[in-house]
């Protein structure tokens, strides 16, 4: 097999822009957070590089999420509740929304992603008055449980009863989703579900990023 130090610049010679998709191994937190695969492409390709998904961030998806909220929000600073992801949290903080993260204890995100968000361990309390509910599951971050699943409690599933606590909130998920584990059929198939337009906005977010990168080549 060709070494990355040769393979990456060879790939760079074939194109103008490179999109890289890589994943966390959940064996070594420091290694995952260094984003070694993505960083090697940035360092050695000689081309503009964008992340299609990486160990700690999924920027095109979270950009699409932001576009979706901007399209559907009815107030300047909506309440957005992320319930039991790093990039989504970054964008919500950057947008200065009323952002709440709710999850079981032990699933705290890395501090740089929490930002100014309010962390609420009581999911029902967090959902009160929400305008958008973004469901996502993730593994533990803190040592010694990094990468582990600590809670399999179905009580965290987003269902109609919990959505009734909100201010007629829209439901969001990046897809694919495990139905009736993350969210019930009733919620994801409801008129307030934005999962399809949210997915469609992935095309828009990618187009915006690629356009900016290609303009920079001129």
Predicted regions: what they are:
Residues 1-70, 179:
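Phosphate/diphosphate ligand-binding glycine-rich loop within oxidoreductases
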Residues 30-51, 145-166, 191-192:
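A short, gly/pro- and small-residue-rich
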Residues 168-170, 174-218:
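Adenosine-phosphate binding glycine-rich loop
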Residues 19-20, 49-53, 58, 82, ...:
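General beta-strand structural signal in soluble alpha/beta enzymes
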């Amino acid at each position: 097999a060709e070494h990355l130090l040769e393979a990456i610049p060879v790939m760079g010679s074939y194109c103008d822009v490179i999109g890289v998709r890589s994943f966390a191994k959940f064996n070594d937190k420091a290694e995952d957070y260094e984003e070694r695969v993505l960083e090697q492409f940035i360092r050695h390709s000689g081309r503009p590089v964008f992340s299609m998904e990486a160990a700690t961030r999924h920027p095109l998806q979270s950009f699409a999420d932001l576009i979706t909220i901007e399209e559907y929000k009815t107030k300047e600073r909506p309440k957005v509740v992320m319930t039991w992801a790093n990039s989504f949290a970054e964008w919500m903080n950057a947008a200065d929304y009323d952002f709440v993260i709710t999850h079981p204890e032990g699933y705290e995100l890395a501090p740089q992603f929490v930002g100014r968000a309010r962390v609420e361990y009581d999911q029902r309390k967090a959902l009160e008055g929400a305008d958008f509910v973004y469901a996502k599951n993730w593994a533990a971050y803190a040592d010694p449980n990094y990468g582990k699943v600590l809670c399999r409690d179905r009580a965290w599933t987003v269902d109609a009863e919990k959505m009734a606590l909100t201010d007629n909130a829209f439901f969001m998920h990046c897809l694919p989703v495990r139905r009736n584990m993350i969210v019930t059929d009733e919620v994801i198939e409801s008129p307030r579900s934005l999962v399809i337009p949210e997915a469609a906005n992935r095309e828009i977010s990618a187009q915006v990023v690629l356009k900016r990168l290609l303009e920079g080549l001129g």
